[in-house]
Amino acid sequence: MQQALAGGAWTVLPDRIEAGTFAIAAAITGSRLLLQPVVPGHMQAAAEALRRSGVEVDLGAASMLVIPPRTGRLAPTDIQTAPHPGFPTDLQPQMTALLATAAGRSTVREAVFDGRVRHAQELRAMGADIRTADNRTLHVWGRPSCLRPGACVAARDLRGGAALLVASLAVEGATTIQECWHMDRGYEQLDNKLRAVGADIQRVPSPAITAAASACNNTD
């Protein structure tokens, strides 16, 4: 006998990738940041990677506190992505950006998605010393002040764009990120949330989009 469907209620889980992105942003800028709500069990792998890089991470019942390294410098560490509960592939580009500012060599191994290394080219344009060993492996030669102001880079995909945004926060000066709409697919008001904790971010229309909109508005 067919049964009728009934209504129900469900609480959406906090986004571990958004929380991890903010945690990495705090770490790369040497900032103290409290994130909540989070599910601690979902953040263990990201927290462990940050701890190996010298960052203090305190996971509470529903919170994550990120504290800058006591030494004032990030340490190199190796990471390899894996399905949950391993290190998330969707945080690999952001962590690569962070490791570019650590003092020493790190190796990043992408074991989930083939070819997820395109962000390395754009990070190199910002001054990072990243060498692509193959389409799954990056060798990062970190230097604390390697990222230069004035770069104009492009977000080729969602998480690669987040990596560029995280890296730009560590730059003393302006960085232009084109095609930032990629980030809107995976983050809700990312620029506004970062501004709320002190980031200087301005979203401006690209000339191509402005010209296209103007042409549409002038069409009879």
Q: Where on the chain are the PLM-derived regions?
A:
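Short, structured segments at the rim of ligand-binding sites
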Residues: 1-220
